């Protein structure tokens, strides 16, 4: 989470980013952006929808947004992202982790319909699709297939040597 020199949280719609987003759009570049944690990050552990999130946030309370009211909440972060997309309609954006709308493909579809230059990847959130109605998810994937990218968010178990290691050996 980024703070400015005054200690204020910097959101995706901060005007200081406008020249960067404008330049990217003008050059036809794509912004790949992680713009928010999963909605589960802002729920009590016992209300989270997937086991992986329950385990992760229970073991890592420093990242559990609900426990940190000083951090802008989920709704504020998503709203800031949406305002940024509205201000930069020609900027191509890939929203990592299903655009942080992993909990509901209908909600994500509304954003994809509203923002034609928005695409999303599946990294680290595909499990959230598995708990939604199969037919609804299948229809969503078919309809938006040209705007959904496969992603892994692959980690190597927090191994400090992973960054310098031969990927083939790490995957063996």
Identify the function of each model-found stretch.
Residues 1-64, 116-119, 124-126, 134:
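Active-site gating/metal-coordination segments in enzymes
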Residues 11, 68-71:
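Charge-dense, low-complexity intrinsically disordered segments
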Residues 69, 75-83, 88-172:
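H/E-rich (His + Asp/Glu) clusters that bind or coordinate divalent metals
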């Amino acid at each position: 989470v980024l703070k400015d020199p005054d200690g204020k949280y910097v959101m995706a719609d901060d005007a200081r980013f406008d020249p960067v987003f404008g330049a990217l759009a003008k050059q036809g570049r794509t912004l790949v952006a992680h713009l928010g944690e999963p909605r589960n990050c802002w729920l009590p552990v016992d209300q989270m929808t997937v086991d992986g999130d329950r385990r992760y946030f229970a073991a890592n309370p420093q990242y559990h947004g609900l426990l940190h009211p000083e951090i802008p909440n989920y709704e504020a972060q998503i709203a800031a992202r949406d305002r940024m997309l509205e201000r930069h309609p020609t900027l191509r954006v890939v929203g990592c982790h299903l655009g942080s709308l992993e909990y509901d493909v209908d909600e994500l579809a509304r954003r994809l319909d509203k923002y034609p230059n928005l695409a999303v990847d599946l990294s680290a959130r595909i499990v959230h699709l598995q708990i939604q109605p199969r037919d609804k998810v299948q229809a969503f994937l078919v309809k938006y297939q040209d705007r959904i990218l496969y992603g892994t968010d692959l980690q190597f178990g927090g191994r400090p040597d992973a960054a310098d290691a031969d990927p083939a050996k790490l995957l063996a």
